[in-house]
Amino acid sequence: MTVPTTRKDLMIVNMGPQHPSMHGVLRLIVTLDGEDVIDCEPILGYLHRGMEKIAENRTIIQYLPYVTRWDYLATMFTEAITVNAPEQLGNIQVPKRASYIRVIMLELSRIASHLLWLGPFMADIGAQTPFFYIFRERELIYDLFEAATGMRMMHNYFRIGGVAADLPHGWIDKCLDFCDYFVTGVTEYQKLITRNPIFLERVEGVGFISGEEAINWGLSGPMLRASGIQWDLRKVDHYECYDEFDWEVQWQKEGDSLARYLVRINEMTESIKIIQQALERIPGGPYENLEVRRFDRTRDSEWNDFDYRFISKKPSPTFELSKQELYVRVEAPKGELGIFLIGDQSVFPWRWKIRPPGFINLQILPQLVKRMKLADIMTILGSIDIIMGEVDR
């Protein structure tokens, strides 16, 4: 009888791009020695759609529907960064009521994004129940979005100088009811997950990142704050009206997957505090800056020609971008979402560079999974929280 010999060669395995734990079309080429990970090489680009080049051939208004396809789980943030850039270029003031509405929508979108991170993350490490629970609260948020914007996901709600429409009658009361209900929902999650011994075994001490490493790799968002760095752009950049509310930056010092989970869970509670304060203090007044219309660039006279009278499509408003450059950023659920914009005295941007948080945060993955077990890849990748739409752009 021949005794089978032990395999001595390293094994190279493809994970993705169809694997359910890849959270999109991410492909990992993993080198294994048994169950131990020797090397990991991420392969990107399966969802590349040329979003930056499209922006250079569209006006800002025409481009707004495209941006919701970057991070399609936190679309309010991509819309916010898109309108913030021309607002700063043109020195356009946003009415106070519009700013409050923006904050409410941004924080609701942050909660929805964190919820849809939590469910699949728990499913990746073997806990299926929270995956079904999170859809209850997420559905309530989408009902609020649908009532205010008309769309559940791709909202197209933000406008240069304000928002597309005011909040409908009864919406504020409905949102306050949701906030009261959601506080009990977060408590339920913490009872179900946070002290679960099997969950702690899978995440505690896995994927450790020190504060120095987080800064050197350019990490942001919960990835940075879970490593002991108290950095939140809502506090640092003072954009919109976040300074008017009482809330705290959530952070942990352990730097592992458990710390990143705790940061996101606590951030949802802080978002509820911000929303409740904004709903109670929301001022009256206009929801858009009517002066923005003077920035509209007059169409060429050919639009009045006979041939164009039968075109039913109304020309979209355009805004001339002055000849300067700037970088704007917001604190998205996954980290720092930024845009580097160069104007050229034209209605089209000369350059529109997107700084997606997921792409930067994903760079540290090969270092985190080395010398770990194969099963830990799902835990570490899930704790990073990526959406391939913004990674590949």
UniProtKB/Swiss-Prot annotation:
E.C. number(s) listed in UniProt: 7.1.1.-
Xref: InterPro entries: NADH_Q_OxRdtase_suD, NADH_UbQ_OxRdtase_49kDa_CS, NDH1_su_D/H, NiFe-Hase_large
Gene Ontology cellular component annotations, sorted alphabetically: chloroplast thylakoid membrane
One example GO MF annotation: quinone binding
Recorded topology in the membrane: Peripheral membrane protein
Chief place of localization: plastid
Pfam families: Complex1_49kDa
Gene3D superfamilies reported for this sequence: Cytochrome-c3 Hydrogenase, chain B
GO biological process: photosynthesis, light reaction
Catalytic function, reaction form: a plastoquinone + NADH + (n+1) H(+)(in) = a plastoquinol + NAD(+) + n H(+)(out); a plastoquinone + NADPH + (n+1) H(+)(in) = a plastoquinol + NADP(+) + n H(+)(out)
Enzyme class per UniProt: translocase
Localization of this protein: Plastid, Chloroplast thylakoid membrane
The keyword NADP appears for this protein: yes
Record has Flavoprotein as a keyword: no
Keywords assigned by UniProt, alphabetized: Chloroplast, Membrane, NAD, NADP, Plastid, Plastoquinone, Quinone, Thylakoid, Translocase, Transport
Function in brief: NDH shuttles electrons from NAD(P)H:plastoquinone, via FMN and iron-sulfur (Fe-S) centers, to quinones in the photosynthetic chain and possibly in a chloroplast respiratory chain. The immediate electron acceptor for the enzyme in this species is believed to be plastoquinone. Couples the redox reaction to proton translocation, and thus conserves the redox energy in a proton gradient.
Similarity field: Belongs to the complex I 49 kDa subunit family.
PANTHER family: NADH DEHYDROGENASE [UBIQUINONE] IRON-SULFUR PROTEIN 2, MITOCHONDRIAL (PTHR11993:SF10), NADH-UBIQUINONE OXIDOREDUCTASE 49 KDA SUBUNIT (PTHR11993)
Subunit description: NDH is composed of at least 16 different subunits, 5 of which are encoded in the nucleus.
The protein, known as: NAD(P)H-quinone oxidoreductase subunit H, chloroplastic
High-level lineage: Eukaryota, Viridiplantae, Streptophyta, Embryophyta, Tracheophyta
